[in-house]
């Protein structure tokens, strides 16, 4: 049974590979934030009276910046620890969330799109790289299965938060700014995972 296998793997991670578990919590939070921001950039553009053509242009701009950002972080990964670069990317997204509060024109929207692009592809690639380094090689298949489930579920929880804020009367800018919480807590859990030293019995 697929669900039994999934829950069995999650239980194994929670009891035997807590470093992996801490990272997965961090990953779930910050990648959910990434997905939510990307999904709602269009809504912010609409509020700023950006037409459909303009939205497509900004999306293409974001993807181009993301490609360049991935190349830059790829070079940096040869000199710095993966976790250090992950901290930079998460902090960058945290700043993007807060910047959303100041948006009032298309120039500001362009700056936000640039910020999203800078860290989007890099955060995803660095996360996968770090995960591959901390999991037991013999469990890579099933562990990456859980990782991919978390990745594909990106923006689920964040979308609920966005909807709740808007339902309470908040603007889309305020709603996006609340996603900073996801990155802040994700940063903390990544720090915990990075500093976690597994007791000997966890490796037996």
What is the role of each PLM region?
Residues 101-112:
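Helix-loop junctions at membrane interfaces in 12-TM secondary transporters
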Residues 164-183:
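A membrane-interface helix-boundary motif in multi-pass transporters
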Residues 1-24:
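Juxtamembrane intracellular "pre-TM" segments in multi-pass secondary transporters
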């Amino acid at each position: 049974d697929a669900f039994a296998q999934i829950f069995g793997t999650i239980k194994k991670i929670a009891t035997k590979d807590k470093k992996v578990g801490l990272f997965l919590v961090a990953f779930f939070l910050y990648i959910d934030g990434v997905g939510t921001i990307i999904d709602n950039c269009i809504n912010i553009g609409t509020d700023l009276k950006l037409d459909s053509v303009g939205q497509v242009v900004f999306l293409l701009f974001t993807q181009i910046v993301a490609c360049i950002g991935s190349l830059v972080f790829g070079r940096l990964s040869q000199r710095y620890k993966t976790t250090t670069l992950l901290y930079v990317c998460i902090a960058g997204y945290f700043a993007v969330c807060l910047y959303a509060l100041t948006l009032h024109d298309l120039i500001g929207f362009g700056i936000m799109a640039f910020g999203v692009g800078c860290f989007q592809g890099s955060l995803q690639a660095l996360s996968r790289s770090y995960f591959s380094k901390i999991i037991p090689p013999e469990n890579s298949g099933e562990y990456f299965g859980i990782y991919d489930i978390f990745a594909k579920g990106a923006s689920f929880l964040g979308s609920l938060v966005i909807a709740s804020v808007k339902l309470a009367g908040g603007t889309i800018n305020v709603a996006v700014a609340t996603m900073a919480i996801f990155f802040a807590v994700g940063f903390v859990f990544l720090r915990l995972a990075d500093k976690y030293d597994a007791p000997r019995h966890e490796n037996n």
